[in-house]
């Protein structure tokens, strides 16, 4: 048997006599800084976000209000600036816009030039300006001389050994007399036979040609009286005084010098005069 001392017996009795305490569950756990840090940071962030949102809203409202105030302020001062500009403009233009005379009751307005009382009166200056405007010098338009073609139905014979000279003279004659009839001969040996077969109002001959030159043709024409009513014109580069005298002795009526730098009127009138003079001799 186990022996128990009085102290142990007393302790056992006290334990058995006292009611059993209900078992307690310890729900508290060990809590440290690292476990609560995430929670604290989340709470802090949410609070700062709400504060920042509120501050942003306040700033936007304040910005809109300041923009509106700035706009109204600018509008107000812009209108004031415009009024000031108009006032300054009026002050600058008034002395030049309205001019009065001390000894006259009338008012004269000169928007361009100020009035000088020592030289002329405003009334005289206005009258002189009006008269100068009315009496502007009218420059006459240049007079162009229009050459009208002659519609006479002439018949011409052109004799030249150079085909280019033939074409040039042919073109000029058609400009002068659009209804004329022209025969061109490059071989001067054919002229005599053609003159016996066909009549012409005038013949245009070159002087320097091979075989039969212009002097030979002129002498042949003037020896036959039936050609007296036909005009004869020399078209040549020979224009000395001796040559012109020789042409006249051979019965050539007129000489055009090459190149043909004559006005159309001069050539047309010269040809008309030659033909009319020859026809009137008969």
Swiss-Prot record:
Compositionally biased intervals (Polar residues): 66-77
Protein name per its UniProtKB record: Stress response regulator protein 1
Keywords: Phosphoprotein
4-aspartylphosphate modifications at: 206
KW Phosphoprotein (keyword) present: yes
InterPro entries registered for this protein in UniProt: Bact_response_regulator (IPR050595), CheY-like_superfamily (IPR011006), Sig_transdc_resp-reg_receiver (IPR001789)
GO biological process assignments: filamentous growth of a population of unicellular organisms in response to biotic stimulus; phosphorelay signal transduction system; positive regulation of filamentous growth of a population of unicellular organisms in response to biotic stimulus
Biased composition (Low complexity): 12-30, 41-58, 125-139
Transmembrane segments: none
Spans annotated as Disordered: 12-31, 41-84, 112-139
Highest rank taxon of the organism: Eukaryota
Cited function: Required for stress adaptation, morphogenesis and virulence.
SMART domains per the UniProt record, alphabetical: REC
Domain Response regulatory, residue spans: 155-273
């Amino acid at each position: 048997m186990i022996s128990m001392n009085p102290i142990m017996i007393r302790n056992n009795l006290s334990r058995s006599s006292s009611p059993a305490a209900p078992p307690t569950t310890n729900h508290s756990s060990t809590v440290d800084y690292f476990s609560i840090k995430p929670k604290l940071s989340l709470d802090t962030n949410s609070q700062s976000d709400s504060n920042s949102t509120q501050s942003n809203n306040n700033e936007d409202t304040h910005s809109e209000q300041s923009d509106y105030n700035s706009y109204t302020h600018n509008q107000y001062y812009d209108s004031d600036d415009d009024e000031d500009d108009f006032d300054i403009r009026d002050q600058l233009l008034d002395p030049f816009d309205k001019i009065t005379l001390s000894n006259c009751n009338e008012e004269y307005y000169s928007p361009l030039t100020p009035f000088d009382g020592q030289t002329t009166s405003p009334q005289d200056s206005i009258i002189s300006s009006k008269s100068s405007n009315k009496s502007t010098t009218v420059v006459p338009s240049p007079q162009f001389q229009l050459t009208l073609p002659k519609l006479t139905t002439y018949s011409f014979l052109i004799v030249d050994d150079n085909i280019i000279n033939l074409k040039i003279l042919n073109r000029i004659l058609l400009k002068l007399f659009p209804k004329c009839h022209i025969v061109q001969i490059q071989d001067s040996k054919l002229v005599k036979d053609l003159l016996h077969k066909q009549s012409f109002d005038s013949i245009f001959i070159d002087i320097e040609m091979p075989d039969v030159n212009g002097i030979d043709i002129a002498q042949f024409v003037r020896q036959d009286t039936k050609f007296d009513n036909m005009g004869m014109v020399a078209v040549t580069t020979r224009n000395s005084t001796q040559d012109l005298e020789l042409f006249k002795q051979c019965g050539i009526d007129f000489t055009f010098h090459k190149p043909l730098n004559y006005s159309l009127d001069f050539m047309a009138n010269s040809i008309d005069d030659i033909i009319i003079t020859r026809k009137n001799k008969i």
